[in-house]
Protein backbone atom coordinates (compact mmCIF):
# COMPACT_ATOMS: atom_id res chain seq x y z
CA UNK A 1 0.00 0.00 0.00
CA UNK A 2 1.25 3.50 -0.84
CA UNK A 3 2.88 5.40 2.08
CA UNK A 4 0.52 8.36 1.44
CA UNK A 5 -2.52 6.06 1.94
CA UNK A 6 -1.00 4.53 5.09
CA UNK A 7 -0.40 8.04 6.48
CA UNK A 8 -4.03 8.97 5.78
CA UNK A 9 -5.26 5.79 7.48
CA UNK A 10 -3.06 6.47 10.52
CA UNK A 11 -4.58 9.96 10.82
CA UNK A 12 -8.13 8.55 10.59
CA UNK A 13 -7.32 5.86 13.18
CA UNK A 14 -5.99 8.54 15.57
CA UNK A 15 -9.10 10.66 15.01
CA UNK A 16 -11.28 7.61 15.78
CA UNK A 17 -9.54 7.20 19.16
CA UNK A 18 -9.80 10.95 19.81
CA UNK A 19 -13.56 10.94 19.09
CA UNK A 20 -14.01 7.89 21.32
CA UNK A 21 -12.38 9.80 24.21
CA UNK A 22 -14.52 12.90 23.51
CA UNK A 23 -17.72 10.82 23.62
CA UNK A 24 -16.87 9.79 27.17
CA UNK A 25 -16.32 13.41 28.25
CA UNK A 26 -18.98 14.95 30.52
CA UNK A 27 -18.97 18.27 28.61
CA UNK A 28 -19.64 16.49 25.32
CA UNK A 29 -22.48 14.44 26.83
CA UNK A 30 -24.07 17.66 28.14
CA UNK A 31 -24.09 19.19 24.64
CA UNK A 32 -26.59 16.94 22.82
CA UNK A 33 -26.00 18.40 19.36
CA UNK A 34 -22.21 17.94 19.60
CA UNK A 35 -22.68 14.47 21.08
CA UNK A 36 -24.88 13.44 18.11
CA UNK A 37 -22.41 14.87 15.56
CA UNK A 38 -19.47 13.07 17.21
CA UNK A 39 -21.48 9.82 17.44
CA UNK A 40 -22.09 9.99 13.68
CA UNK A 41 -18.39 10.68 13.03
CA UNK A 42 -17.41 7.79 15.33
CA UNK A 43 -19.72 5.39 13.46
CA UNK A 44 -18.30 6.54 10.10
CA UNK A 45 -14.68 6.07 11.26
CA UNK A 46 -15.22 2.73 13.03
CA UNK A 47 -15.06 0.48 9.93
CA UNK A 48 -11.90 2.20 8.59
CA UNK A 49 -10.20 2.07 11.98
CA UNK A 50 -11.06 -1.61 12.56
CA UNK A 51 -9.97 -2.61 9.06
CA UNK A 52 -6.70 -0.65 9.38
CA UNK A 53 -5.92 -2.29 12.75
CA UNK A 54 -6.43 -5.72 11.13
CA UNK A 55 -4.15 -4.70 8.23
CA UNK A 56 -1.40 -3.58 10.65
CA UNK A 57 -1.64 -6.93 12.48
CA UNK A 58 -1.32 -8.81 9.17
CA UNK A 59 1.83 -6.80 8.28
CA UNK A 60 3.35 -7.97 11.58
CA UNK A 61 2.35 -11.57 10.75
CA UNK A 62 4.06 -11.25 7.33
CA UNK A 63 7.24 -9.95 8.99
CA UNK A 64 7.25 -12.81 11.53
CA UNK A 65 6.69 -15.44 8.80
CA UNK A 66 9.53 -13.99 6.70
CA UNK A 67 11.92 -14.25 9.66
CA UNK A 68 10.88 -17.90 10.17
CA UNK A 69 11.83 -18.77 6.55
CA UNK A 70 15.51 -18.87 7.59
CA UNK A 71 14.82 -21.79 9.95
CA UNK A 72 14.85 -25.09 7.92
CA UNK A 73 12.53 -26.79 10.41
CA UNK A 74 9.98 -23.98 10.28
CA UNK A 75 10.27 -23.13 6.57
CA UNK A 76 7.29 -25.15 5.29
CA UNK A 77 4.95 -23.80 7.96
CA UNK A 78 6.31 -20.27 7.46
CA UNK A 79 5.65 -20.44 3.70
CA UNK A 80 2.05 -21.47 4.35
CA UNK A 81 1.61 -18.69 6.95
CA UNK A 82 3.17 -16.15 4.56
CA UNK A 83 0.84 -17.11 1.70
CA UNK A 84 -2.26 -16.82 3.92
CA UNK A 85 -1.11 -13.50 5.40
CA UNK A 86 -0.41 -11.99 1.96
CA UNK A 87 -3.86 -13.06 0.71
CA UNK A 88 -5.46 -11.52 3.80
CA UNK A 89 -3.41 -8.33 3.32
CA UNK A 90 -4.65 -7.98 -0.28
CA UNK A 91 -8.28 -8.43 0.82
CA UNK A 92 -7.92 -5.82 3.56
CA UNK A 93 -6.24 -3.36 1.17
CA UNK A 94 -9.19 -3.67 -1.22
CA UNK A 95 -11.63 -3.10 1.65
CA UNK A 96 -9.65 -0.05 2.81
CA UNK A 97 -9.65 1.43 -0.70
CA UNK A 98 -13.45 1.18 -0.82
CA UNK A 99 -13.76 2.65 2.70
CA UNK A 100 -11.58 5.61 1.64
CA UNK A 101 -13.73 6.47 -1.40
CA UNK A 102 -15.31 9.93 -1.18
CA UNK A 103 -18.69 9.63 0.51
CA UNK A 104 -21.81 11.20 -0.96
CA UNK A 105 -22.92 13.55 1.87
CA UNK A 106 -26.55 12.79 0.98
CA UNK A 107 -26.22 9.01 1.45
CA UNK A 108 -27.21 9.03 5.13
CA UNK A 109 -30.29 11.20 4.54
CA UNK A 110 -33.98 10.39 4.32
CA UNK A 111 -35.37 10.36 0.80
CA UNK A 112 -38.42 11.24 -1.24
CA UNK A 113 -39.50 8.38 -3.51
CA UNK A 114 -41.67 9.16 -6.53
CA UNK A 115 -43.22 6.43 -8.67
CA UNK A 116 -45.02 7.53 -11.83
CA UNK A 117 -46.98 5.43 -14.33
CA UNK A 118 -45.64 5.94 -17.84
CA UNK A 119 -46.71 4.26 -21.08
CA UNK A 120 -49.23 1.46 -20.76
CA UNK A 121 -52.38 3.04 -19.28
CA UNK A 122 -54.11 0.99 -16.57
CA UNK A 123 -51.39 -1.67 -16.63
CA UNK A 124 -48.70 0.98 -15.97
CA UNK A 125 -50.70 2.34 -13.01
CA UNK A 126 -51.07 -1.19 -11.58
CA UNK A 127 -47.33 -1.74 -11.95
CA UNK A 128 -46.63 1.62 -10.24
CA UNK A 129 -48.66 0.22 -7.32
CA UNK A 130 -46.63 -3.00 -7.38
CA UNK A 131 -43.35 -1.05 -7.38
CA UNK A 132 -44.48 1.13 -4.48
CA UNK A 133 -45.46 -2.00 -2.53
CA UNK A 134 -42.04 -3.52 -3.33
CA UNK A 135 -40.22 -0.46 -1.96
CA UNK A 136 -42.52 -0.34 1.09
CA UNK A 137 -41.72 -3.99 1.90
CA UNK A 138 -38.01 -3.27 1.51
CA UNK A 139 -38.34 -0.26 3.83
CA UNK A 140 -40.24 -2.37 6.37
CA UNK A 141 -37.47 -5.00 6.38
CA UNK A 142 -34.89 -2.26 7.08
CA UNK A 143 -37.08 -0.68 9.79
CA UNK A 144 -37.52 2.53 7.81
CA UNK A 145 -40.65 4.67 8.08
CA UNK A 146 -42.79 5.30 4.97
CA UNK A 147 -45.05 8.35 4.89
CA UNK A 148 -47.21 9.00 1.81
CA UNK A 149 -46.98 12.67 0.80
CA UNK A 150 -49.32 12.58 -2.18
CA UNK A 151 -51.05 9.94 -4.28
CA UNK A 152 -53.09 9.97 -7.46
CA UNK A 153 -54.82 6.61 -7.84
CA UNK A 154 -55.33 4.80 -11.14
CA UNK A 155 -58.88 4.19 -12.40
CA UNK A 156 -58.55 0.41 -12.01
CA UNK A 157 -56.11 0.33 -9.08
CA UNK A 158 -52.47 1.20 -8.57
CA UNK A 159 -51.24 4.78 -8.94
CA UNK A 160 -50.82 7.32 -11.70
CA UNK A 161 -48.31 8.93 -9.33
CA UNK A 162 -47.32 8.43 -5.71
CA UNK A 163 -44.78 10.37 -3.62
CA UNK A 164 -43.58 9.10 -0.25
CA UNK A 165 -41.00 10.19 2.28
CA UNK A 166 -38.86 7.33 3.57
CA UNK A 167 -37.05 7.97 6.85
CA UNK A 168 -34.27 5.93 8.45
CA UNK A 169 -30.54 5.20 8.41
CA UNK A 170 -28.90 5.52 5.00
CA UNK A 171 -32.14 5.59 2.98
CA UNK A 172 -30.89 7.73 0.09
CA UNK A 173 -27.61 5.81 -0.22
CA UNK A 174 -29.49 2.51 -0.63
CA UNK A 175 -32.25 3.73 -2.93
CA UNK A 176 -30.59 6.37 -5.13
CA UNK A 177 -29.75 3.90 -7.91
CA UNK A 178 -33.48 3.12 -8.30
CA UNK A 179 -34.02 6.41 -10.17
CA UNK A 180 -34.86 5.81 -13.82
CA UNK A 181 -37.13 3.74 -16.04
CA UNK A 182 -38.66 0.43 -14.88
CA UNK A 183 -40.33 -1.74 -17.52
CA UNK A 184 -42.80 -4.58 -16.94
CA UNK A 185 -43.72 -7.42 -19.29
CA UNK A 186 -46.76 -9.46 -18.28
CA UNK A 187 -50.22 -10.62 -19.32
CA UNK A 188 -52.84 -8.16 -18.00
CA UNK A 189 -55.84 -9.61 -16.15
CA UNK A 190 -58.11 -8.19 -18.87
CA UNK A 191 -56.15 -9.85 -21.72
CA UNK A 192 -58.23 -12.78 -23.05
CA UNK A 193 -55.72 -13.89 -25.71
CA UNK A 194 -52.86 -14.33 -23.22
CA UNK A 195 -50.70 -11.73 -24.98
CA UNK A 196 -47.81 -10.16 -23.08
CA UNK A 197 -48.04 -6.38 -22.74
CA UNK A 198 -45.12 -4.05 -22.02
CA UNK A 199 -45.69 -1.06 -19.72
CA UNK A 200 -43.32 1.36 -18.04
CA UNK A 201 -42.98 3.44 -14.89
CA UNK A 202 -40.42 6.00 -13.82
CA UNK A 203 -38.92 6.19 -10.36
CA UNK A 204 -37.18 9.24 -8.90
CA UNK A 205 -35.35 9.20 -5.56
CA UNK A 206 -34.24 12.51 -4.02
CA UNK A 207 -32.52 13.24 -0.69
CA UNK A 208 -34.52 15.16 1.90
CA UNK A 209 -32.49 18.29 2.57
CA UNK A 210 -32.27 20.12 5.89
CA UNK A 211 -33.93 23.57 5.78
CA UNK A 212 -30.53 25.30 5.76
CA UNK A 213 -29.56 23.51 2.53
CA UNK A 214 -32.82 23.90 0.62
CA UNK A 215 -32.47 26.06 -2.51
CA UNK A 216 -33.68 29.63 -2.11
CA UNK A 217 -37.16 29.80 -3.58
CA UNK A 218 -38.57 33.22 -4.34
CA UNK A 219 -42.26 33.26 -3.24
CA UNK A 220 -42.98 35.36 -6.35
CA UNK A 221 -41.91 32.34 -8.45
CA UNK A 222 -44.65 30.16 -6.96
CA UNK A 223 -48.25 29.69 -7.98
CA UNK A 224 -50.21 28.09 -5.16
CA UNK A 225 -53.63 26.56 -5.83
CA UNK A 226 -55.91 25.00 -3.24
CA UNK A 227 -58.51 22.35 -3.98
CA UNK A 228 -60.63 19.79 -2.20
CA UNK A 229 -58.79 16.59 -1.43
CA UNK A 230 -60.06 13.28 -2.72
CA UNK A 231 -59.56 9.78 -1.36
CA UNK A 232 -59.45 8.42 2.19
CA UNK A 233 -60.11 10.73 5.09
CA UNK A 234 -63.66 10.14 6.25
CA UNK A 235 -66.18 12.96 6.61
CA UNK A 236 -63.53 15.64 6.35
CA UNK A 237 -62.80 14.89 2.66
CA UNK A 238 -64.32 17.33 0.16
CA UNK A 239 -65.52 19.71 2.87
CA UNK A 240 -62.54 22.10 2.85
CA UNK A 241 -59.93 23.19 0.32
CA UNK A 242 -57.07 21.59 2.27
CA UNK A 243 -55.18 20.11 -0.70
CA UNK A 244 -52.32 22.16 -2.16
CA UNK A 245 -50.79 22.36 -5.62
CA UNK A 246 -47.57 24.39 -5.94
CA UNK A 247 -46.13 25.30 -9.33
CA UNK A 248 -42.56 26.61 -9.53
CA UNK A 249 -42.90 28.91 -12.54
CA UNK A 250 -39.19 29.14 -13.61
CA UNK A 251 -38.81 25.33 -13.87
CA UNK A 252 -42.41 24.22 -14.40
CA UNK A 253 -42.08 21.74 -11.49
CA UNK A 254 -45.49 20.95 -9.97
CA UNK A 255 -46.04 19.35 -6.55
CA UNK A 256 -49.38 18.35 -5.07
CA UNK A 257 -50.05 17.36 -1.49
CA UNK A 258 -53.42 16.34 -0.07
CA UNK A 259 -52.51 13.78 2.55
CA UNK A 260 -52.98 15.98 5.63
CA UNK A 261 -56.25 17.50 6.81
CA UNK A 262 -54.57 20.84 7.40
CA UNK A 263 -53.80 23.11 4.44
CA UNK A 264 -50.81 24.49 6.37
CA UNK A 265 -49.29 20.99 6.83
CA UNK A 266 -49.92 20.09 3.18
CA UNK A 267 -48.18 23.31 2.09
CA UNK A 268 -45.14 22.58 4.30
CA UNK A 269 -44.87 19.04 2.89
CA UNK A 270 -45.28 20.25 -0.71
CA UNK A 271 -42.57 22.90 -0.24
CA UNK A 272 -40.09 20.31 1.12
CA UNK A 273 -40.73 18.04 -1.90
CA UNK A 274 -40.45 21.04 -4.25
CA UNK A 275 -37.09 22.03 -2.71
CA UNK A 276 -35.79 18.46 -3.13
CA UNK A 277 -36.97 18.36 -6.77
CA UNK A 278 -35.33 21.70 -7.63
CA UNK A 279 -32.11 20.53 -5.94
CA UNK A 280 -32.25 17.23 -7.88
CA UNK A 281 -32.77 19.10 -11.18
CA UNK A 282 -29.76 21.35 -10.41
CA UNK A 283 -27.63 18.30 -9.54
CA UNK A 284 -28.64 16.54 -12.78
CA UNK A 285 -27.69 19.64 -14.78
CA UNK A 286 -24.31 19.80 -12.99
CA UNK A 287 -23.66 16.11 -13.63
CA UNK A 288 -24.42 16.59 -17.33
CA UNK A 289 -22.04 19.54 -17.49
CA UNK A 290 -19.31 17.50 -15.79
CA UNK A 291 -20.16 14.33 -17.74
CA UNK A 292 -17.03 12.62 -18.93
CA UNK A 293 -16.82 9.44 -20.97
CA UNK A 294 -17.44 7.52 -17.75
CA UNK A 295 -20.94 6.10 -17.45
CA UNK A 296 -23.18 7.38 -14.73
CA UNK A 297 -25.05 4.59 -12.96
CA UNK A 298 -27.14 7.16 -11.11
CA UNK A 299 -30.30 7.63 -13.16
CA UNK A 300 -31.97 10.99 -13.52
CA UNK A 301 -35.45 9.58 -12.89
CA UNK A 302 -36.09 10.16 -16.57
CA UNK A 303 -38.07 7.73 -18.73
CA UNK A 304 -35.09 7.40 -21.10
CA UNK A 305 -32.98 5.83 -18.31
CA UNK A 306 -33.80 2.14 -18.64
CA UNK A 307 -32.86 0.56 -15.33
CA UNK A 308 -34.71 -2.72 -15.16
CA UNK A 309 -37.13 -5.03 -16.90
CA UNK A 310 -39.47 -7.19 -14.81
CA UNK A 311 -40.64 -10.14 -16.94
CA UNK A 312 -43.47 -11.96 -15.13
CA UNK A 313 -44.03 -14.95 -17.50
CA UNK A 314 -40.34 -15.90 -17.11
CA UNK A 315 -40.04 -14.84 -13.44
CA UNK A 316 -37.04 -12.78 -14.51
CA UNK A 317 -35.68 -9.37 -13.54
CA UNK A 318 -32.84 -7.77 -15.52
CA UNK A 319 -30.76 -4.73 -14.56
CA UNK A 320 -29.62 -3.36 -17.92
CA UNK A 321 -26.96 -1.04 -16.44
CA UNK A 322 -24.81 -3.92 -15.20
CA UNK A 323 -26.17 -6.80 -17.32
CA UNK A 324 -27.48 -8.64 -14.27
CA UNK A 325 -30.34 -11.14 -14.70
CA UNK A 326 -31.99 -12.98 -11.81
CA UNK A 327 -34.81 -15.54 -12.00
CA UNK A 328 -36.13 -14.50 -8.58
CA UNK A 329 -38.84 -12.03 -9.51
CA UNK A 330 -41.31 -13.18 -6.82
CA UNK A 331 -38.76 -12.45 -4.09
CA UNK A 332 -37.85 -9.07 -5.63
CA UNK A 333 -41.52 -7.99 -5.76
CA UNK A 334 -41.80 -8.94 -2.06
CA UNK A 335 -39.11 -6.36 -1.29
CA UNK A 336 -35.97 -8.53 -1.28
CA UNK A 337 -34.06 -5.85 -3.16
CA UNK A 338 -30.56 -6.23 -1.72
CA UNK A 339 -29.74 -8.83 -4.39
CA UNK A 340 -30.21 -6.02 -6.96
CA UNK A 341 -29.01 -3.05 -4.91
CA UNK A 342 -25.70 -4.55 -3.66
CA UNK A 343 -24.28 -5.36 -7.15
CA UNK A 344 -25.03 -1.84 -8.44
CA UNK A 345 -23.39 -0.23 -5.38
CA UNK A 346 -20.32 -2.45 -5.90
CA UNK A 347 -20.20 -1.51 -9.60
CA UNK A 348 -20.41 2.18 -8.65
CA UNK A 349 -17.53 1.74 -6.18
CA UNK A 350 -15.47 -0.02 -8.87
CA UNK A 351 -16.10 2.93 -11.20
CA UNK A 352 -15.00 5.36 -8.46
CA UNK A 353 -11.81 3.35 -7.84
CA UNK A 354 -11.06 3.32 -11.58
CA UNK A 355 -11.56 7.10 -11.73
CA UNK A 356 -9.21 7.59 -8.75
CA UNK A 357 -6.47 5.41 -10.26
CA UNK A 358 -6.76 7.37 -13.54
CA UNK A 359 -6.26 10.64 -11.61
CA UNK A 360 -3.16 9.22 -9.94
UniProtKB/Swiss-Prot annotation:
Keywords: Cytoplasm, Methylation, Protein biosynthesis. Pfam families: PCRF, RF-1. Methylated by PrmC. Methylation increases the termination efficiency of RF1. The keyword Protein biosynthesis applies. Residues 285-313 are annotated as: Disordered. One of its GO terms (molecular function) is translation release factor activity, codon specific. SUPFAM superfamilies: Release factor. Its main location: cytoplasm. The modification N5-methylglutamine is found at residue 235. GO terms for cellular component: cytoplasm. Peptide chain release factor 1 directs the termination of translation in response to the peptide chain termination codons UAG and UAA. Belongs to the prokaryotic/mitochondrial release factor family. This is Peptide chain release factor 1. It comes from Shigella boydii serotype 18 (strain CDC 3083-94 / BS512). The gene is prfA.
Amino acid sequence: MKPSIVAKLEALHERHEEVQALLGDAQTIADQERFRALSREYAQLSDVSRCFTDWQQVQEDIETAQMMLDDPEMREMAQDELRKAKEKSEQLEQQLQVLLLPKDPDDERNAFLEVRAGTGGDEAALFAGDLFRMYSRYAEARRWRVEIMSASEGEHGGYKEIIAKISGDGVYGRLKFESGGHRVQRVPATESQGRIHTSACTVAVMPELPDAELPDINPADLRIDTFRSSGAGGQHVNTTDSAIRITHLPTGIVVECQDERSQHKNKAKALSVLGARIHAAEMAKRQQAEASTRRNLLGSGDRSDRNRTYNFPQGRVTDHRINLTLYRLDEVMEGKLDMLIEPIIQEHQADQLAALSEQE
